[in-house]
Structure formats: structure tokens, C-alpha cells
Amino acid sequence: MNVQLCSIRIETLGCRLNQTEAESFAALCTDAGFSIYTGHTGYASTTPADTPTITAPEAAAPIRLSSALPPEQTVLCFVNTCTVTGKAEQKARRLIRLLVKTHPYAVILVTGCYAQLEAAAIEALHPHILAFPGQQKDLLTEIPAYLAKLVADSAYFDTAFFLSAVRAYLTDLTTKVPQHTQTKPVQNSSVQNISIHGIRESRLFALSSPHFLFHSRALLKIQDGCNDACAYCRIRLARGKSVSLPAAEVLERLRCIEETGAHEVTLTGVNLSQYRSEVGDFADMLKLILENTEMRIRISSLYPDRIDETLVPLLAHPQICPHFHLSVQSGSDTVLKAMHRGYRKATIYQAVSELRRVKDNPFIGADIIAGFPGETEADFEETYRMCRELEFAGIHAFPFSARPGTEAWRMQPKVPERIAGQRIKKLNELAETQSASYLQAWDGKLICGVVEAPRNGQQTVITENYLSLPLIRDSLQESNLHGGEYVRVRVQGKNAVLTEIISDPHS
């Protein structure tokens, strides 16, 4: 079989960590000679992995069957799953069934948090499914090259043979993993004597690439896992204790990303507040990053109690994007205490005040859970009032989902789904109003951003403050810009009018 005539379909559900890891797997697949595509965006890329051009938009559309390539040409479907809510797992099962239906001869390789906790249940969905634990997904770095060899050595594709071979290969790899790895020394006087770190830390950061097929803006995972014990959260069970990428490796990976021509990078992690390395905590690492790169830095998520006197001055730096997403969850002290969150409502107000003090009208978003066990109407009204008073430009509101293995699984009294749904509806209506108000406040103003790759003849720009706007060009300007280009635009209603292509965004 000819590897170049075979394709691998990649699907990602959940957080930016999953997106980062899926991008890295995609880059390895292109290195091995496969074509890569996703049902979210259609055909993605056949360009070599060392080509920095981005060829697919960032925003994922709702799940749909793809007709991008004939199903018989797809030898593997890679699915990175999420377990944050019951609906996330339901969505994963639905996607897996769609893949089985669309690609009846392909191996369905499922990994991620859901696969870490429910591998047997996932494999029971169909004989062609191989569920691989999320905490061992580093071993997947070996799969593309191995699969390419299998394809090249085979006259035709036999699903049972390929599934058995991949399963055996992964099993064999688990017995041959070295016990420790040595990090590379960094060429910086403030980072020396890098220590050897354990195999789990090495594993969790193995999937990494400076090249991105599905995103116009780079992603860098610097932390994984969580040491907290929030009553509702199952992610800590799936990803384990907090681990961090050593500072030397952070800087090395940033250097590789910057060399591709990237103008912006998002730092990702399960809980960036728990980043620890030989240079100190997250604030110390951020300071070092700002000293060693000229790229714009976007921070994926922060806890309100981490917006303190050591971090705030760094967030004022001009390279830090004026966009902050806070893991808030509730505006009721009673509910926050029951959730085992390490802060109270006053801390949230203080954090938002500090962010607005150091940045000019930043985009501030928040995660909110409605319907947590015991949440009264008064508790919810406190949360709603906080969201209104703090004028969050984005609110990610979702109903409480009881997760097996968590303390909240058995907490009483349960809030009826109907009531939780009403609260979500009210929060979503507020979010829509405040989002529109935030956009209106920027009408007529200039701002910089990164262009997304064309989709259906239209391009969008993601501004520094996280506005996603259709890009308007006049007839004298280029018909299409490359995804990833850095531009200056003027906000005009719900659109962005191109005013300048910035060749050097650091000037």
C-alpha cells in the first residue's frame, strides 16, 4: 500500500490541552507521510510538518460526517476525549459511533481523559476501537511511523490485523519506557543546573510540536494535572497530580515555535497556578518567558486567587494579551466553600479590579457552574449579580454534572435539572448582552490580531482581546491572507476592517 494515498482523521473534544496534543500527533502523522483531515473542518493539510503555513481554521464546527476523503482511504481515526461532564462523554460516544459508521474499515484510536477512566466501556462500543489511557498518550508519538511501516509492508488494509498490531506495539512500548530523562540546559544565566525529572513528567509533555495544522495561533502546554480536590471535578482523577514542564524545556519549545514565524502563543495547562519548576512558580516562569521571547503571550486560564502582587505586574507587560479567562465557578461564598474552591467572592472582585487596572478594557471571561448541589435561588442570584457587576465579556455557563468518583457525586440536595437549565438560560442571556456591549465599546478603535485561515471564502481575525471578527479588505488588498499573519484592524460594528499587515509585530 502507498502511505501517501492513506489518510488519518483527527478529532478533538475538550480543552486546549487536548487540542495541543492532537496538533502534535497530526504533525507526526504528516512526517510519516499520511494525509490529515478532520470532520470538523474538512480536509486540513498534506503539507510537510516543517511548513509553518496554517491550512485549517481554529474554531471547530459542530460534529458532522465528513466527505472530505473516501472512507476506505482512512486507516486510522484518532479521537482525543474529555470527561469534564456527562455530556462531554456522551458527545465522545456519539462521535465514535459516527466514525465507526463513516470509516467501517479504520482503526478507531481513542485517548484522553475519558479513555483514561472508562477504557473498557469505550472498547465495548465496537470491535475496531482501541482505547488508550490518557496518561500514556506519550507513547502515541511512536504510532505514526509504525503505522506507516505497516501500511508500506501490506498489500491491502486488514482492520483486524492492523488493530492487533497497533495494540501489541503499544503494549510492548509500555514495558520499554526509560525510567528518567535528562532535560536540555537552557542558554540563559538565570536557569542553570537543570535537574533530572521523573518519567511521568517526561511522558505528559512528550506530545509537542511547534507546527500547527488546525490552529493559526500556537499552543504550548507547560503544566498538567491538578493537586486540588474540588468537589465536582473528575479531571484530576484522569490527569493525576500536578506536573510542570521544566523551565529550560519551556524556553526551548518557545524558541522552536518562534522560529516558525508565529506571532502569538497560548500557554496551556490544567491549572497554570500550580506550575512549579527550578525557577519557581508560574509568575517566575512568565517573567523568564517575557525575557526570552518577543511573541505575544496569551494565558489560557487563571484562578482568581492567583491574580496577586507577584503576577499582576507581569500581566501589565505589553506582550501579554489583554484577554483573561478566570475559573470562577460561583459568586456565592456558600457554594464556593462546598465546592472546595480556595477563594471567596471578594477575591474574584479584587482579581477583576487588578486586571482592569493593568490593562485597558481587557476581555475578561469566566467559567460558571449553575445548579451545584445545595445551590439555593439566593446563591444563584449572588452569582448572577456578580457576573453582571463585573461585566464579564464572556461567560461559559454550564449546568452541574455529577461525576463518578467525586465528592459532589453524592452531595445533597440535588438541584432539579429544570431549575439548573433556567439558571443557565438566564446566564447565557446576560452573557449575550455583555458580549455585545464589550464589542460596542471597541467600535471604531484600532487593535491588532492574528488572521485565521480562509473558510468558505471568508477570513476572520482573532484580536489581542479575543474578539473573533470577519475580516473586511478593500479591492486593492490581497484577496486572501495566510492564516497566522499579524494585522492591525479597525473594529467596525461586528466586523474588522484591515488597515495594515504588520511584518514585524514586535516593533
Language-model region placement:
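Residue-level signal for inorganic ion chemistry
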Residues: 78, 113, 267, 299, ...
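Short, solvent-exposed loop/turn segments at secondary-structure boundaries
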Residues: 88-90, 241-246, 276-280, 338-341, ...
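Conserved SAM/AdoMet-binding glycine-rich loop
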Residues: 108-109, 117, 258-380
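Short flexible coil/turn linkers enriched for glycine and charged/polar residues
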Residues: 214-215, 226-227, 330, 362, ...
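Active-site proximal loops enriched in glycine and acidic residues that flank catalytic Cys/His/Asp
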Residues: 12, 269, 301, 328-330, ...
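Proteins enriched for Cys/Gly/acidic motifs involved in redox and nucleic-acid/cofactor modification
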Residues: 1-268, 273, 310-313, 324, ...
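Terminal RNA-binding accessory module
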Residues: 410-507
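Extended hydrophobic-aromatic, low-complexity segments
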Residues: 324, 336-337, 348, 357-363, ...
